[in-house]
Amino acid sequence: MEANGIENLTNPNQEREFIRRHHKHELVDNQCSSTLVKHINAPVHIVWSLVRRFDQPQKYKPFISRCVVKGNMEIGTVREVDVKSGLPATRSTERLELLDDNEHILSIRIVGGDHRLKNYSSIISLHPETIEGRIGTLVIESFVVDVPEGNTKDETCYFVEALIKCNLKSLADISERLAVQDTTESRV
């Protein structure tokens, strides 16, 4: 058991292996990249039911108010998302790069919008684990993005990491609530 109370089936070596295997990004000059990890007290199937919905990211991403999809959820499908006020953008155009229901991996690339996240791409992968004796999910999300003129790599990574951390916290809150409902309903 780790100091934070998480009994983890995915040891640090397994976590590194998941990152090595699923989170490959080719960086060029003037880009930054980072990988974030979140442990969620809900089974993979519940977390994946939210993450895989390329057509409904607003289900767990608090900064998205609306999403319109052009395509039929195949690789190359494009979505137009409206961003809530308070962020330095109003819309983003994103393309589905990978949707793997067996390995639980989703990858997107931003292809347009009125923001400064140029050449942004991200990969999110889910992995089963045990947390405090219960079935849980290890979520790994990585990204690469151009550093905008006038910003440093650290500033850019900090900004994107803050957005992803908010998304992952929301994903955890919603997934854990759904897991409790699922457990309660299965007892009835």
UniProtKB/Swiss-Prot annotation:
Gene3D superfamilies: 3.30.530.20. Upon interaction with ABA, the 'latch' and 'gate' loops change in conformation leading to a tight dimerization and the creation a surface that enables the receptor to dock into and inhibit the PP2C active site. Residues 25-176 are annotated as: START-like. The keyword Disulfide bond applies. The record marks 88, 152 as: Involved in interactions with PP2Cs. GO terms for cellular component: cytoplasm; cytosol; nucleus; plasma membrane. The modification Phosphothreonine is found at residue 77. A motif (Gate loop) lies at residues 85-89. A motif (Latch loop) lies at residues 115-117. The keyword Nucleotide-binding does not apply. This is Abscisic acid receptor PYL8.
